[in-house]
Regions:
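Double-stranded beta-helix
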Residues: 99-148
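Short histidine-centered beta-strand/loop micro-motifs
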Residues: 29-35, 52-57, 74, 81-83, ...
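A short, N-terminal "cap"/entry segment at the start of jelly-roll beta-barrel domains
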Residues: 1-38, 140-148
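Non-heme Fe(II) oxygenase catalytic core, chiefly the N-lobe of the double-stranded beta-helix
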Residues: 5-7, 48, 132-137
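A short beta-strand-loop-beta hairpin characteristic of the jelly-roll/cupin
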Residues: 56, 60-86, 96
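Conserved short histidine dyad/triad with adjacent acidic residue
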Residues: 20-30, 40-57
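Conserved metal-binding segment of the jelly-roll/cupin
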Residues: 46-49, 84-105, 113-115
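Conserved hydrophobic/aromatic positions in well-ordered beta-strands
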Residues: 42-44, 63, 111
Length: 148
């Protein structure tokens, strides 16, 4: 699993870094093409109702629905929502809290494009960090998932 929230029920998913390392909290996650300049590309597959929880980045993130229907929420508490259908695109600004989940009834894919050559780590919403700690997971000083 690539991310702290993917250790929590409802947020399990598969990530495939294609170009560049993207953002990951698992040091074993390696991209197909390591070299990336100015952008990173990742595919994600999620079951119905699952996907990344509320988080932000200090770089631009673009979501492109490839299959299925996706809910994208944003705002400090995820209070805004829009639905993406195949090939719909949304760009989430730097620092904006966002989450995305499969809103369909079967497994679905979406594509993420991250701006920058070396995108920064994920900034999780406080409730995600607390839920992960309650489940026995933290991030170490290097930003990697550790079980406690």
């Amino acid at each position: 699993r690539f991310f702290l929230d993917s250790m929590l029920p409802g947020h399990e998913r598969l990530n495939y870094n294609v170009i560049g390392s993207g953002v990951s909290e698992n040091p074993d996650a390696k991209p197909a093409i390591e070299y990336a300049e100015d952008f990173n590309l990742t595919y994600m597959k999620a079951a119905p109702g699952k996907g990344p929880s509320l988080h932000s980045h200090d770089h631009i993130e673009v979501f492109i629905a490839m299959t299925g229907r996706w809910s994208v929420t944003w705002g400090e508490e995820g209070q805004h929502e829009i639905f993406l259908e195949p090939f719909d695109v949304i760009s989430v600004p730097v620092g904006e809290m966002r989450a995305i989940r499969n809103a369909g009834d079967s497994d679905a894919w979406h594509l993420m494009i991250l701006g920058g050559t070396n995108p920064s780590r994920v900034e999780w919403h406080d409730n995600v960090i607390q839920r992960a700690q309650d489940a026995g997971f933290v991030l170490d000083e290097d930003g990697n998932i550790q079980e406690v």
